[in-house]
Amino acid sequence: MEFSFSPKRLVVAVAAALPLMASAADTPSTATARKGFAGYDHPNQYLVKPATTIADNMMPVMQHPAQDKETQQKLAELEKKTGKKPNVVVFLLDDVGWMDVGFNGGGVAVGNPTPDIDAVASQGLILTSAYSQPSSSPTRATILTGQYSIHHGILMPPMYGQPGGLQGLTTLPQLLHDQGYVTQAIGKWHMGENKESQPQNVGFDDFRGFNSVSDMYTEWRDVHVNPEVALSPDRSEYIKQLPFSKDDVHAVRGGEQQAIADITPKYMEDLDQRWMDYGVKFLDKMAKSDKPFFLYYGTRGCHFDNYPNAKYAGSSPARTSYGDCMVEMNDVFANLYKTLEKNGQLDNTLIVFTSDNGPEAEVPPHGRTPFRGAKGSTWEGGVRVPTFVYWKGMIQPRKSDGIVDLADLFPTALDLAGHPGAKVANLVPKTTFIDGVDQTSFFLGTNGQSNRKAEHYFLNGKLAAVRMDEFKYHVLIQQPYAYTQSGYQGGFTGTVMQTAGSSVFNLYTDPQESDSIGVRHIPMGVPLQTEMHAYMEILKKYPPRAQIKSD
């Protein structure tokens, strides 16, 4: 059959199609119209738009007056109804990748179903571009201080009693406590074991959990993991004598930590279940209180070494210890959520679900990400984490690629407690810079847009990259050593290299960050470089801090 092109016919055809196209644009597709998804937000278009400085010691923000006004009205009406400020729950997974959960395309597809997590996510705001720091401890400190690692100074996870932590920093739990909140920490801490950095001394009324990280309790005891240590009395005794806590502990504000039990590999199997039970009891207690609460809940799963509870062993289609622990984490989250639901607390509770970094690709079996890199790197796979926020009746179900950093939880929670926007600047010393941006109106506004213009990435205390819109500019990158395998994903054993200055990637067309467009699209690099230089000016006035580092 012969095809002939007619410009006249093309014009007529396009004209006839325009009404249909407009109608289709106004109507969600079948896929996005299903219950729980009101549609997908367009990403930010902030590349060449200026941000506004609201306080000298706070990150400049993109302002949206209409959504700010709507949000404050919603909060005022809710407080009038409930008689108290909203509760905040942060549910923080460990080493879980962006694509481990069903709401990001994983779950069943990767052999570890997360049905309850996905169900709640579908009724909340799924954040496809939420960012952590490259590893655990820096991220946890970022959540509790509102600062990037370069400012709070925890650049690496402290290991085996290494000194340093949150001491001397202004923390979210302390500020919320000052506002009348009951503050509870449960689970993994890993922000310093020295007394001044322990949770009961940095703002929490109560703490139940462990001070460090899973593998530090088990790797020197498990003959299947480290036989060269576990089977050597001298070596295992050496580790045992190092000055780090080896127990599941409990403490109350200002008190001493009390050991509950020695954390052996066998005890580790039940740890997440024990912590979950403690969390349920806390929520039940708060259901009878007239005070708002802040629950910071850090799971043990799914950091290596994974010891799934006996009833979850073999429960995942993947049949791996990691997959089994993911199934267990789904149930832990579900039990906490159902307790809030049973108690009628969902109407007045912001739930934040997230992970502390990307998957730990150096220790299989591990999590998954569709992006380049993994934990320990500033490639997207190392720092883009599975995240959603949920608040019954307050957050419109949708997805957004608006940029969010976990530092944003600090000013956002303080906004809910009665300190919106620039008021946060007065709660911290003038020498403290808040890298977080108040995202309350983004979360609660109708089709809200992110208030954050840019994401900044850090490696070993240095500014490594910046992202605005879909574009990302690297000045430092992490690459594997020459002896590692070609499929290496990046982590703590890589090497940091400086780029030649034109490493710009379009994360929409190249999520693997494999084909730089810096030379072909120089105009895209200009605003990114400008943003990087602007943050360097911030660092001159508010210098970097390094208290826990790799060297």
Swiss-Prot record:
EC number assigned by the record: 3.1.6.-
Main location: periplasm
PANTHER family cross-referenced by the UniProt entry: ARYLSULFATASE FAMILY MEMBER, ARYLSULFATASE G
Organism, scientific name: Escherichia coli (strain K12)
Location of the protein in the cell: Periplasm
InterPro entries, alphabetized: Alkaline_phosphatase_core_sf, Sulfatase, Sulfatase_CS, Sulfatase_N
UniProt-listed Pfam families: Sulfatase (PF00884)
3-oxoalanine (Ser) modification, residue list: 136
Post-translational modification: The conversion to 3-oxoalanine (also known as C-formylglycine, FGly), of a serine or cysteine residue in prokaryotes and of a cysteine residue in eukaryotes, is critical for catalytic activity.
UniProt keywords, alphabetically: Calcium, Hydrolase, Metal-binding, Periplasm, Signal
Name used for this protein in its record: Putative sulfatase AslA
